[in-house]
Each structure stands twice: as structure tokens, then as C-alpha cells.
């Protein structure tokens, strides 16, 4: 049985979340709290397996409560947000910076066409997060200096440096991407294209949050633009993203793949066709297998590929599947990915890689 603490200042919303969570036979809401201070007390008294956390609360808000919990009694925290306004979403992602593992929108109300899907998603994420051993796994990345070239590793021969980096992430991806992008040097010489599975409405706020710590400009990708060196392009809500022969970004309403639009597989397939061995591609933490087969395709085309290791992943789904398929040239802990990317795009014929 998964024991959950629900932290929400609105009594109506609190009862709604309790109703959804208790509808699953594997979940029990063992305690509730109306603000951050009550949450700290309930945590000490009940020791839940997972906490769902509101952001805007009296006395102690969700960001402050998350930080205190992660410093004193680390517990998997899922942020449940009632707003997709970019300014407020930025605050929501501050809770990720403080140690929360996932962000979800508040499920749609009973009778709404999206109620069942959003309620099911919340239950699914709570179950997944209950299996995560929280050890403040990204704390050591924060405040780190930009990635250096001193990472020791095997030598790989390349006839030319990479021309593009593509990355896919899902559950646990936001803090992983923040850790990587904040550690890349300011003059990173190639563009970076990213697909991050995220609930519709959160991407703009997520990009704003990344901009606060990244040394590189971060954008939501736009139709027809040519990716610039040292810029980061995030696939937008509800669009598939690919590149065409000149390297320009193309956004489509093609069908979802692996239940996702944007899909990592969709982007990776296009990059394999257009860039082939001139690409560096990787899969980070996340559930499912989106991008795993296509990472193997990229490797077969001569691209350098990587997968995040199990120890530093929140959920070792996509990356784990890629490793099982033999799709990853390298398996890397999160804290070494930025240095490896920096080395891979360096302008030299032989590139040392992080391991």
C-alpha cells in the first residue's frame, strides 16, 4: 500500500485530490495539510511514501516546504499545480529546484472530458514516485562551474566534431535538464534540440525557469527557424518536431508516437536522416521507451549516443530500454553528461568522452 500525504490549502481541492487518490486500491491518503507548516508536522507524524504538494499556501509555501522536507526527511514530492500561467509555472519549477520530483496539473473536475485521463495520470505518477529513493541526487550539480574537458574516458575517433545535439527526457527530466544546461559553457558551438514530455500548458513556464540558470539561450522552437549554435530549442506543446535537409526546424501535427506529441522518436528519426554521424544524441530519465529504437538507429548511422545511468535517473525507462538494445555508445551519470557533451562538440578530430 502506498501512503500519501496531500498538502493543499483549498478544502474543496483537497477533498477532490483525496477522492481521486483513494479511488485506487493501492493508494491510501493517510494525512492532509492545509499549509507548509502543517505538512512538516504531518510528515514527522505519519512518514508517507509520497507527498502531493500545492505551491501557493499561507505560512509556508510549497517551495519552502519542499526545501525543508528535502533537507530534513527526504520524501518523494509531486507538485500539483492549479495554474499554467508562465509566471506562476516558474514558481512551480522552483519546487523542482528544491527537490520535488514531478509537476502535474490539477486533475480536471468530474464531468470534464479530461477528468479520467488527468486523474489516471496523477495516480500513475504517484505510484511511480513511491518507488524512487530520494537522495537529493541533483544537489551536487547546483552551483557547479561550467563543464570542463578534464573528464577521464576512452578515446573515440571522429573525422569531424558534432554539428547538433539532440536529447529526450520524460519523468524526472526537468531537474536533469536544468543540471545539464546550467553546466554547459556559454559558447557551446552547436545547437541543442530537446523533447521533454510535459503536460500541455507548462512548457512556456518551464523554458522561463531554464533561462534563469542556463548559460545558453533557451527557446520554444518555431516553425522554419534554423537552429543557431549555442542555442537550446524545446519542442512546443502538442507539436511533433523534426529537422529537414537544410537543418531547419519543422513542426507538425502528425500523430503521437508512444502516446506523446512531441515524441522523442519522431525527432531522433529525422536527425538520423539529416545529420547521421554528425549528431550526438541521448536519452535521460523517463518512463516508457520513446526514442530507444531511434537512438539505436542514430548509433547505426555513426552518431555518438548516450543514456543516463540508472543510479542518477528518477525512472530508468527510456534510457534503460536504450541500454538493453545496445543503443548507447556511453552510459553516463547525470553529473558527467555536460562535460561529455562539451568534449564531443569540441573542434578536434579525436574526442575524449566522459564515462
UniProtKB/Swiss-Prot annotation:
Report whether Hydrolase shows up as a keyword of the record.
yes
Under Gene3D superfamilies, the record lists: 3.40.50.2300, Methylesterase CheB, C-terminal domain
Check the record and name the SMART domains matching this protein: REC
**Domain CheB-type methylesterase per the UniProt entry, residue ranges:** 154-348
For this entry, list what GO says about its biological process.
chemotaxis
Residues in domain Response regulatory?
A: 3-121
On modification after translation, the UniProt record reads: Phosphorylated by CheA. Phosphorylation of the N-terminal regulatory domain activates the methylesterase activity.
Chief place where the protein resides: cytoplasm
Record Pfam families: CheB_methylest, Response_reg
Any one GO molecular-function label of the UniProt entry: phosphorelay response regulator activity
Query: Per the record, what are the reactions this protein catalyses?
Result: [protein]-L-glutamate 5-O-methyl ester + H2O = L-glutamyl-[protein] + methanol + H(+); L-glutaminyl-[protein] + H2O = L-glutamyl-[protein] + NH4(+)
The record's comment about this protein's domains reads: Contains a C-terminal catalytic domain, and an N-terminal region which modulates catalytic activity.
> What does the UniProt function comment say about this protein?
Involved in chemotaxis. Part of a chemotaxis signal transduction system that modulates chemotaxis in response to various stimuli. Catalyzes the demethylation of specific methylglutamate residues introduced into the chemoreceptors (methyl-accepting chemotaxis proteins or MCP) by CheR. Also mediates the irreversible deamidation of specific glutamine residues to glutamic acid.
- Name the family: Belongs to the CheB family.
Q: What is this protein called?
A: Protein-glutamate methylesterase/protein-glutamine glutaminase
Species the sequence originates in:
Nitrosospira multiformis (strain ATCC 25196 / NCIMB 11849 / C 71)
